[in-house]
Each structure stands twice: as structure tokens, then as C-alpha cells.
């Protein structure tokens, strides 16, 4: 799950890259060492040539594509986009895909919510700990938090 990026691209930079701004729900695969890292973009983002972006565009469910990529490992040091493009994706009929999305989509949303909650709790801990240690704040003062 990719909730945010470390760096932000400028409009000028976005105009110079071929990938453009990729939509939320894009499945990303690192194609250079380290190869095989996989994530689902939960925010629009831009990538460099070290990634393969699988935009589902409603043709296939993001969760199905994610699970398909996780099920197909690799031992290569690098995979080019040219070598990746002809790979065939075998997928079930729409009824089964819909059932899959109902189950796995709910689980994925829960995972995303838990990651967000964990990030908020980490931020709260990082903000409160120094104040508690220094005595600037006491536990009794934060009971309502």
C-alpha cells in the first residue's frame, strides 16, 4: 500500500515524463534491482523508468491484478517493459471477479485503514513522547486524548 510519496513532482517535471500522472489503484512493480517490490498506489503519482505500472482502468480489478502479480514470482535481476508487456493474464469470468472483489476489496480497504491509523498513532507517539519525558506534559493532562 502506497499512501504517500517522499517527494512531489512539479508540473514542469510531470510534463517531461512519459508515464504522466498515474491514477489511484495503479499496481506498481519495481523492474530494476531490487526487482519485484509490488504496491498499490492509493494516491495519484508519477514514476521513473525503474517501475512497471499496471493501470487497471476498470478492465480488471486492482486487487485481482495485485494478487496475480504476487503469485507470479521472478528470479531475474531486471525485467524490461518490452519483456513484460506480452505476458498474458489469465482471469476468471466477471461473476467470479465480482465475488473476489467483494471479499478481497474489503480486506484491502481494512489494511489501508489500519496503515493510516498506525501512521496517526506513530505521529501522536512521536509528538507526545518528548513532552512527557521532559515533563512539559503529564499523563494526567492527556487523559482525554
How should these model regions be labeled?
Residues 1, 35-38:
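Flexible loop/turn segments at secondary-structure boundaries
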Residues 1-24, 42, 47:
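Sequence-specific dsDNA recognition surfaces
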Residues 11-31, 37, 58-68:
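Polybasic, glycine- and aromatic-enriched phosphate-binding surface used to engage nucleic acids
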Residues 12-13, 53-54, 111-112:
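Short, contiguous acidic/charged loop-to-helix segments that flank catalytic cores in large enzymes
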Residues 20-22, 46, 80, 105, ...:
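Solvent-exposed alpha-helices and their adjacent loops that cap or buttress functional pockets
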Residues 31, 45-52, 71-98:
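A short glycine-rich beta-alpha junction/loop motif
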Residues 52, 66-70, 130:
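Generic alpha-helical structural context detector
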Residues 59-60, 83, 87-145:
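Amphipathic alpha-helical coiled-coil/heptad-repeat segments
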